[in-house]
Amino acid sequence: MAWVQIRLNSTDKQAEQISDFLEEIGAVSVTFMDSQDTPIFEPLPGETRLWGNTDVVGLFDAETDMKAIVEALIASRLVEADFAHKIEQIEDKDWEREWMDNFHPMQFGKRLWICPSWREVPDPNAVNVMLDPGLAFGTGTHPTTALCLQWLDSLDLTGKTVIDFGCGSGILAIAALKLGAKQAIGIDIDPQAILASGNNAEANGVADRLQLFLAKDQPQDLQADVVVANILAGPLKELAPNIITLVKPQGDLGLSGILATQAESVCEAYAPDFNLDPVVEKEEWCRITGVKK
């Protein structure tokens, strides 16, 4: 099926109104895109934070009268009469196949591979985690996830308990279990993440060793030999007292989701309780690790 799209620029305040209107007049999907390469950090849970200068892209069936769409936008008064816009025909492709072709097995450290379920594992004797891209964050493609996976691969997890704080897809907890951990515990504020982690654990045959909790239901006396938290700098600092108590004495801590420019302030929150290692950087992101005193 062929498609046509309209792209127009908007402020963050109007973008959602324009999106709603485009859907009302027949758009099959609407996408927000950054028009000025502006980073967005640390939205609140449930918040959709947009760029100050946002491109709104509405996708329509190719038979749609786009002149009528433009006229409807003007009549809605959500845009000026002479608003700048671009209309493009979209090539008809097997989008699912193209999407699948973009994901390949990835190696982290010496032993660990993350593989999409539709790909053949490169090394059957390696530690293979089968994980498909989904709604919850974490497939190994982001530098922060890669940093955490490499760190877990470097540890001897045999017989240990691991907490994945902010578990998302469950990728870190599942990797830890496959790397030898006796038990893993995933904690997240998002029910979608709990569901995704459970499904991914089932697919990897480790569901019987993974416990999952919404953050509000986290047991009070919970502790582990290893705690990994791949969230963001703000929550890592705000939740430091909680995260610190999760780590057993002499236990290992790994933190990421941190921009390199934020490393110093995050280290300050944990340094009193941990002997911290040198910060490891990947692209603009970094990882902080240490052993509890």
From Swiss-Prot:
The gene is prmA. Transmembrane segments: none annotated. The keyword Transit peptide does not apply. It comes from Actinobacillus pleuropneumoniae serotype 5b (strain L20). It catalyses: L-lysyl-[protein] + 3 S-adenosyl-L-methionine = N(6),N(6),N(6)-trimethyl-L-lysyl-[protein] + 3 S-adenosyl-L-homocysteine + 3 H(+). It is an enzyme of class 2 (transferase). Methylates ribosomal protein L11. This is Ribosomal protein L11 methyltransferase. It comes from the Bacteria. The keyword Cell cycle does not apply. S-adenosyl-L-methionine binds at T145, G166, D188, N230.
